[in-house]
Each structure stands twice: as structure tokens, then as C-alpha cells.
A protein has these predicted regions:
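N-terminal glycine-/charge-rich "phosphate-binding" loop or analogous flexible N-terminal tail
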Residues: 1-48
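Short, well-ordered beta-strand segments
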Residues: 3-4, 49, 71, 133
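Structural motif corresponding to alpha-helix initiation and N-cap regions
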Residues: 15, 33-40, 54-58, 79, ...
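Phosphate/diphosphate ligand-binding glycine-rich loop within oxidoreductases
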Residues: 47-127
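A short, basic/flexible loop-to-alpha-helix module at the beginning of a structural domain
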Residues: 128-135
């Protein structure tokens, strides 16, 4: 079995443990980035693919008849042509619950910024002003 990781740069080193892939497959190929023009070459004899942002569509799937599964290291599936995957019998998995807490925290941080102008006040302090407009 062959697994291809198409865009490992999207995952910070240490965030994911890839050893399970190496235990599962005979061959694992890992590419930091894969442009669209290289997808068919990288996936031609792959059984499984792991991706985040690579566009996988009919043209790519036509060139990769062994591909059976695509795992996304993201919540969204917009990088895949899901209908094309269905037609080619390629299963798709994503991580729908990934970063839910972080998104909520970020939303509250932005709300507090809008309400309090924290960034403007921090910039004023860095520029040597203790109170707005007073040197």
C-alpha cells in the first residue's frame, strides 16, 4: 500500500504524528508542497492521499485509478471535487471538529478588540505615549 502526503507544510511540525502512516503502508511519500501540475504524477500509483489544500478533481482522479481514499487535514472540503470523488469511488475524510475552541477564542478576542481598541492602545504605548495623544 502507498500513502502520499501532498502538502505537509500545512501542518506545523509536531502537530501530527505521521508514524501511523508509516506503520500502515509499505511506502509513504511526503511532499512539503504539490502544485496542481504535479498531483497526477505524485498520486499515480497511490492508494491513499493526505492533503490540506491540493485541488483534486476529475482530471487528477482519471490519472490515478488506484486512489481509494483522501484524508484532509482541514475542516473544509472545498479543495476537493466531492462529486468527482464519488464518481471515482474515492472516499473522503476531514476533521470537522478541528480548532472549534480556537475559533471561538479568536471571535471573543476580536470582539474585545473592537470594544476596547486594545491594538491602538498598545501601539500608542510602543510609540511612547502613556495616554492617547499625550507625549
Amino acid at each position: 500500500m502507498k500513502i502520499v502526503v501532498l502538502d505537509s507544510y500545512c501542518v506545523r511540525p509536531g502537530d501530527l504524528d505521521w508514524t501511523g502512516l508509516y506503520d500502515l503502508a509499505d511506502v509513504v511519500e511526503e511532499y512539503p508542497r504539490t502544485g496542481y501540475e504535479l498531483l497526477a504524477d505524485h498520486l499515480r500509483d497511490a492508494d491513499f492521499a493526505v492533503s490540506n489544500k491540493c485541488r483534486i478533481d476529475d482530471a487528477v482522479l482519471d490519472a490515478c485509478p488506484r486512489l481509494r481514499w483522501v484524508g484532509l487535514t482541514a475542516t473544509g472540503t472545498d479543495s476537493l471535487d466531492l462529486e468527482a470523488c464519488r464518481r471515482h469511488g474515492v472516499a473522503v475524510a476531514n476533521v470537522p471538529g478541528y480548532s472549534t475552541n480556537s475559533v471561538a477564542q479568536h471571535a471573543f478576542a476580536l470582539l474585545l478588540e473592537v470594544a476596547n481598541g486594545t491594538a491602538a492602545r498598545a501601539a500608542s504605548l510602543r510609540d511612547g505615549y502613556w495616554q492617547s495623544g499625550v507625549p
